[in-house]
C-alpha cells in the first residue's frame, strides 16, 4: 500500500460523498464505532498499528464505505 498524505485521502473521501464535510464526519464516526466493535477492515491496514479514524477515512476514500453501506451494518 502506498503512503498518501492525510489531506489527499480526506479530499478524495469528501469527493466520494459529494463534498459534504458534515456527512463525512458522521460517516467516519459511524465506521469507527463499527471498527471499535470488531468489524473487519475493508482495506489492508492493521487496526493495532493504525488509528481507526485513518482506516475509516481510507475506506471512504477508496469507495469501500458509503452512507448506504454504513446504514446496512447498523
From Swiss-Prot:
E.C. code: 2.7.7.6
GO annotations of cellular component type: DNA-directed RNA polymerase complex
Gene3D superfamilies recorded: 3.90.940.10
GO molecular function, one term: DNA binding
Enzyme class: transferase
Pfam family, one: RNA_pol_Rpb6
Record keywords, A-Z: DNA-directed RNA polymerase, Nucleotidyltransferase, Transcription, Transferase
GO biological process terms held by the UniProt record: DNA-templated transcription
Lineage top rank: taxon: Bacteria
The reaction(s) this protein catalyses: RNA(n) + a ribonucleoside 5'-triphosphate = RNA(n+1) + diphosphate
Role according to the record: Promotes RNA polymerase assembly. Latches the N- and C-terminal regions of the beta' subunit thereby facilitating its interaction with the beta and alpha subunits.
NCBIfam families named in the record: PRK00392.6-2 (NF001579), rpoZ (TIGR00690)
Assembly with partners or alone: The RNAP catalytic core consists of 2 alpha, 1 beta, 1 beta' and 1 omega subunit. When a sigma factor is associated with the core the holoenzyme is formed, which can initiate transcription.
Family affiliation: Belongs to the RNA polymerase subunit omega family.
Protein name (Swiss-Prot/TrEMBL): DNA-directed RNA polymerase subunit omega
Origin species: Helicobacter pylori (strain P12)
Origin organism lineage: Bacteria, Pseudomonadati, Campylobacterota, Epsilonproteobacteria, Campylobacterales
Gene behind this protein: rpoZ
Amino acid at each position: 500500500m502506498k503512503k498518501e498524505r492525510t489531506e489527499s485521502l480526506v479530499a478524495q473521501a469528501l469527493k466520494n460523498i459529494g463534498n459534504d464535510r458534515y456527512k463525512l464526519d458522521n460517516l467516519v464516526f459511524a465506521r469507527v464505532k463499527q471498527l471499535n466493535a470488531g468489524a473487519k477492515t475493508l482495506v489492508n491496514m492493521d487496526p493495532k498499528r493504525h488509528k481507526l479514524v485513518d482506516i475509516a477515512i481510507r475506506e471512504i476514500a477508496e469507495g469501500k464505505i458509503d452512507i448506504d453501506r454504513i446504514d446496512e451494518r447498523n
